[in-house]
Every structure is written in C-alpha cells, then in structure tokens.
Amino acid sequence: MAFQDLIIQIGSLGRFQILHMIFVLICHALSAPHTLLENFTAAIPSHRCWVPILDNDTASDNGSRILSQDDLLRISIPLDSNLRPDKCRRYIQPQWHLLHLNGTFPTVTEPDTEPCVDGWVYDQSTFLSTTVTQWDLVCGSQALNSVAKFIYMTGIFIGYIMGGHLSDKFGRKLIFTCSLLKMAITETCVAFAPSFLIYCSLRFLSGIFSSTLRTNSALLILEWTSPKFQALVMALIFIASGVGQTLLGGLAFAFRNWHHLQLALSVPMFLLLIPTRWLSESARWLIMANKPQKSLKELKKAACVNRIKNSGDALTLEVVKTIMKEELEAAQTKPSPLDLFRTPNLRKRICLLSFVRFVSVMSLLGLLINIQYLSNNVFLLQCLYGVVCIPANVLGNFSMNYMGRRMTQLIFMSVLGISILAVVFLPQEMQILRVFLSTLGGAISSASITSTLVHANELVPTIIRATALGVVGIAGSAGGALSPLLMILTTYSASLPWIIYGILPFLGGLVALLLPETKNQPLPDSIQDIENKRKSSKEAKKDVVAKVTPL
C-alpha cells in the first residue's frame, strides 16, 4: 500500500497528472467512436429488388413510361405482411391486372415471384453509401451484418486476452503506443477494403488494438493518482467517450459516404502518435517490474512538473526501496494469469467482476449499436447519447463518492434495465418518448460501466492488475461479441433481444452487492494484500462476536 505515500509526496493530482489525463482523454475521444462506427457505416437503408421496368431507363414496353412510379412498383414488387413493398422478392412478370381495382382481371393463383437476382435498389436519402449497399448485405445475407459486428467484438475479446498480459510484461507506455499506431493503420485501411472478407479481417485487428489501447490508457492515468481521485478519473474517461460519440454523430451527419466517414475518424489518430514521446511510464508498474531506478526517474519528473519543492531531493533510490520493500520482494516472482485463480478471495473477485462486466457490456452495446431500431433519426440519437454521458458520469462520480461503488452499480443497472424494457413495449408512434427512454438508458449505461470499471480497478492488485483487468475485460468482450448476435433472434420475435438486454442489468446489479466496498480504500499492490485483508476482516468479526457474547 506504500506507493500511495510516494504519490502524495509528488502530488496526487497536479499538472503532471492533468497533462497526462488530457492526452489520454483525447485518445479516448477519438478511439471510442470506432466501436459504434457501424451504426452508420453498416446502416441498412430501405431497399427493394431491381426491376427492369422501374430501373432501366430504356424500358418502354407496354407504355410503362406513362405510368407513375407507384403504379410501376405495384405491378413489379409484391407486398409483405405489413402491406409494404417486399424487400427481398419481385414478380417474375409485371402484374398489369393489379392496376385494375374493379376486379376485371381476377387472380386465381398467387403470381410467381423470385429473389432479387439482379440486385437491389437502395434509398439514398439518409446514407449515400454503406457497407450494406456496397456488398448487398440484405435479405439472405443480412445476418452477415451482425457477423461483422461480432468479428469486431471478437477482436476486442482477443485484445483483452493479449493486452493485459503484454502490458504487465512490457509496460503500459510501450503497449499503448504500439496499439495506437496499429489501430490508426488498420482503421484507415478499412476504408479501402476491396471485399467484405478483408473488411472483416481489418476490423478484427482493429478490435484487438482498440481494447489494448483503452486498457493501457486508463492504467496510465489511474496508476499516477491517489484512490480519492480514481472515481473522478474513470468518470472523465467515459465523458471523453461521450464526447467521441457526439463527434461521431456530427461527422456521420456530414459524411454520408461510409468511406469518407471511416477516414475522417481514422486519419487524425496518426497525429496522436506525436505526443507519445513525452508520455511517462507508470512508476507503479516500474516498481512492481523490479525497476526502481527507472521508477525513481519518473517520480522525480512528476514532482518537477507538479512544482513540488524539495520532493525531488527527498526522493532517493533508498527511500523508494524502503517504502516499497514488500512490493519489490513480491516482484521477484513474476505473476502469471493463473495466479488470479489460486487464492480464494482474488478468485471470487475475478469471477464476480467478470459476470458483472459481461451483463453490463452486453446490455450497453445492445442499446448503442442498434440505434437504427430505436429511432428514425439516428444522427440525433447518437449525439444525444454522447451529450447525456457527460451529466450522467458526473452524477455517477457523485454517487460513487457518497453511496459507494456497490450501491451505485445496483441503482444504475436497475434504471438501465427498466428503460430498455419500457422501450420494448412502447409503440413506434410514440417516437419522442422512445427517444427519451433510449437516451436515458444510454446515459445510465455509461455511468454504470464507469462504476464497474472503477470497482474492478480497486479490487485487483497492482502486480497483476493489467492481466486481471484483461481477464475481466474478456468477459465484457464476450458479452459485447454476443450482443449483436442476439439481434438475429428478431426473426422469431422482434422484442426478444430487447427483453434479454433489459433483464440482464438487474442480475448484474445484484451480483455487484456480493463484492467488497472500496470507497476511499487504498489500492492493493500484491495478491497477499487481498488475502491479508480477508483474514483481517475475519478476525475483526471474531472480535466483535467475542465482545457481544455474554460470559
């Protein structure tokens, strides 16, 4: 626990931490929209089969030129169960008799239809081009749209597996910089993908680098601040993500061609590589990696930037070694991911945190990546999601500081579940109320995820924190990967996926109550810290029982 003494000595939230925070928050604001990018780049516009009599300018048979578009559509495309033009079938021959409403040409049998063998015609009033229109991901191929999102989420899943371990082994800064570079390259290349297979492959790689980037960027801030500021830091990270969502909505409104939108969000990431040369490695990680000299250098640098007088002279290698003696001894043994499950208390924490992350991320992404199903104006709803994240996370930070981490998760997740379930049973005509509840759900989901991340960071030891957060992140990524696949269930019931999204947050909030409260508690540095705390709490309970038991 002694590292907190060093942080206080150099300034727990000074200019050094603020400059770091600004840079990392900008990175989050530009990287976060890529998770939701397919709300626009893979949007499904209105469509119908291509038919010669409608879409071939040279068609003039049977006097079709004198007929209106509605009449031509009526004789070319059958109606679906909602009495709207079918999106996936057309008549083999024009049904001229359908123009006569007086029954002069009665129909004995249903006219023969066929699939859209000549392709589709897409409505371009909202989107000029999407991946759906480029590769015809509609009708029989519509499930591929969900598969593409699943592949990206699988990349995030793999990234959490690899990123946490690599970060604990090679450091936060190196993995952060490499991930930023590779994500910028892959996302830029996505815009030029010549085929759907290459597109999915590049998005898969981008997902890997995205998760490692975000994990390490959060650690680079959190491990330089004291516990009382960590809830604020996580709230600011999600506020930055909200700014990114608002930016995405604005850019998507400006760039209706998916190639241009992809480049508008990807190319600026290359500029973020320039400030990384001044980024400092986590002094906490350097100590736990048995590199006290490098840690001392970073601590002195932080003290200098924070203008803490005389602290640089007081910080010596002997002081660092003395304060962190137990941690340095623990660092001699390199931890492995299996260490997370060897001791009972840490194992319990990891399992419970993983479940909470799984259900919270599944519901969050279910809401955020399917906004096309919730509102007619996807640009407005996306911007609203981003804007309301700011007050929601401020409220979440206030709640965590006064009610604690566990109660905050329970309350926020319950409200999220209620808002999703309410939207399910509202008719499409009540658009204003649907948008309001969807926006409320998006805001609350952001704040609930913030509280789960803060809680997770405070419950695992520094020596294996990145690996632990990676394992918990894997569970969240699994929920995120399954989230778009649930929309395939709409073929059975339009409400079924949303009912699942709405029920899961209630379960997550209840499970969060089984975890220890960490408000204003110092971060554990070693696995032994967690087990010792468990033993201390047991002994304290025994003492209480002994005092109240009559002789």
UniProtKB/Swiss-Prot annotation:
Primary localization class, coarse: membrane
Membrane protein topology class: Multi-pass membrane protein
Cytoplasmic side, ranges: 1-5, 167-188, 256-259, 371-377, 428-434, 490-495
Positions glycosylated per UniProt: N39, N56, N62, N102
BP GO terms, sorted: monoatomic ion transport; organic anion transport; response to molecule of fungal origin
Tissues and organs where the protein is expressed, per its UniProt entry: Specifically expressed in kidney, where it localizes to proximal tubules of the outer medulla (at protein level). Not detected in other tissues tested.
Function: Sodium-independent organic anion transporter which shows high specificity for estrone sulfate, dehydroepiandrosterone sulfate, and the mycotoxin ochratoxin A (OTA). Transport of OTA is strongly inhibited by estrone sulfate and probenecid, and to a lesser extent by 2,4-dichlorophenoxyacetic acid (2,4-D) and salicylate. Transport of estrone sulfate is inhibited by various steroid sulfate conjugates including dehydroepiandrosterone sulfate, alpha-naphthyl sulfate, beta-estradiol sulfate, 4-methylumbelliferyl sulfate and p-nitrophenyl sulfate (but not minoxidil sulfate).
Family: Belongs to the major facilitator (TC 2.A.1) superfamily. Organic cation transporter (TC 2.A.1.19) family.
Name this protein carries in UniProt: Solute carrier family 22 member 19
Lineage: Eukaryota, Metazoa, Chordata, Craniata, Vertebrata
Gene: Slc22a19
